[in-house]
């Protein structure tokens, strides 16, 4: 019985993550059980005529259910909504507080977008449950937002139109892409109009952040602007040279069997430099991302992990910028970058 219930809870988690909504078909059930959580059953008043046993049993079941629901809310807030939707009050009779810890500790929680969270917050306020309703406003993870594009279950776009790319990226980034080792190899193979130096990935089943990967070679000006502290260490400790052009000339000199796949990863890009270095279109798309909104809510104002850079540690220094952008503006970019006039 427990196994079946836990599987139903996990199925509900996946459904809520996919739909990015907790209302719709479940609205009446959700309202009923949130009301139970936020408003304890009133004490039965004494009567001249004794109440039926079923009334006492029903009252006890509600009290028992509320205790279990609150136990889940306190210890597993990200499973709370799936739990109350799947487990009705009557079924809580067989649950014990100790079992809640044991059975739910391995369940994955819900991870909803900020827009969905705002909608749910507004829904809770309209119900006017009272002070305890504040508990229900913390059901969305306060941890760093993830995106399914970091896994394999994503749509991938790999061949961008270079003529369109100049509209979305700054001149500096466009030139960095054009002079990158990967792009130079494409040109040698007559891939002039399209490039795999610009790739995008989107989640299949929800509207989490999209990922943009740009092969930009090693442009010292880009690195110094976005990651000034990291650049100082790269140049002083690891001996990186400041000329990207000199590294590009070493492509043919590097023997294949000596190729080193390891890389340095730079995170915490300077936010104020993003509009200049990456361009205003990309900056707006980054601001729209769930990750950037989370960073802002958590007072990470001057730097962002929405922009990271991988640099190979040996020549030719190949660099890949990884950008987290909002879903809607990411879709707009993709429809332009990957639409070719034939």
Swiss-Prot record:
Which keywords label this protein? Nucleus
Q: Which domain of life is it from?
A: Eukaryota
**Entry's free-text remark on domains:** The N-terminal bipartite nuclear localization signalis required for nuclear localization and generation of the H-MORPH morphotype.
Question: What function is annotated for this protein?
Answer: Probably modulates the generation of the hypoxia-typic morphotype (called H-MORPH) with altered biofilm architecture that leads to increased host inflammation, rapid disease progression, and mortality in a murine model of invasive aspergillosis.
Organism lineage string: Eukaryota, Fungi, Dikarya, Ascomycota, Pezizomycotina
Q: Which organism is it from?
A: Aspergillus fumigatus (strain CBS 144.89 / FGSC A1163 / CEA10)
Family statement: Belongs to the hrmA family.
Main subcellular location of this protein, as a coarse class? nucleus
Protein name per UniProt: Hypoxia responsive morphology factor C
Region entry RNA recognition motif (RRM)-like domain: which residue ranges? Answer: 151-181
CC annotations in GO: nucleus
Q: Where is this motif: Bipartite nuclear localization signal?
A: 46-68
**What is its subcellular localisation?**
Nucleus
């Amino acid at each position: 019985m427990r196994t079946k219930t836990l599987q139903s809870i996990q199925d509900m988690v996946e459904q809520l993550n996919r739909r990015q909504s907790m209302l719709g078909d479940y609205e009446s059930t959700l309202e009923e059980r949130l009301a139970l959580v936020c408003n304890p059953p009133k004490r039965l008043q004494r009567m001249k005529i004794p109440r039926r046993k079923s009334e006492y049993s029903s009252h006890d079941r509600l009290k028992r259910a509320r205790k279990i629901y609150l136990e889940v809310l306190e210890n597993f807030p990200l499973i709370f909504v799936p739990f109350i939707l799947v487990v009705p009050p009557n079924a809580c009779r067989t649950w014990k507080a100790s079992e809640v810890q044991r059975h739910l500790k391995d369940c994955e929680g819900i991870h909803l977008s900020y827009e969905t969270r705002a909608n749910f917050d507004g829904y809770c306020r309209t119900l006017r449950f009272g002070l305890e309703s504040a508990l229900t406003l913390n059901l969305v993870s306060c941890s760093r937002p993830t995106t399914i594009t970091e896994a394999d279950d994503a749509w991938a776009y790999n061949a961008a139109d270079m003529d369109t790319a100049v509209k979305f990226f700054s001149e500096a980034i466009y030139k960095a892409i054009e002079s990158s080792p990967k792009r130079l190899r494409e040109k040698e193979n007559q891939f002039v109009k399209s490039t795999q130096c610009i790739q995008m990935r989107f989640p299949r089943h929800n509207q989490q952040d999209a990922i943009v990967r740009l092969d930009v070679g090693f442009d010292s000006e880009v690195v110094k602007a976005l990651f000034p502290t990291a650049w100082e260490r790269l140049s002083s400790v690891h001996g990186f040279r400041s000329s990207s052009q000199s590294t590009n000339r070493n492509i043919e000199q590097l023997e294949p069997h000596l190729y080193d796949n390891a890389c340095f990863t730079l995170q915490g890009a300077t936010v104020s430099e993003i509009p200049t270095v990456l361009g205003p279109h990309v900056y707006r798309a980054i601001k729209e991302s769930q990750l950037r909104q989370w960073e802002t809510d958590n007072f990470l104002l001057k730097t962002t992990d929405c922009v990271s850079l991988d640099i190979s540690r040996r020549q030719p220094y190949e660099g890949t910028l990884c950008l987290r952008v909002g879903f809607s503006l990411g879709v707009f970019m993709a429809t332009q970058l990957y639409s070719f006039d034939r």
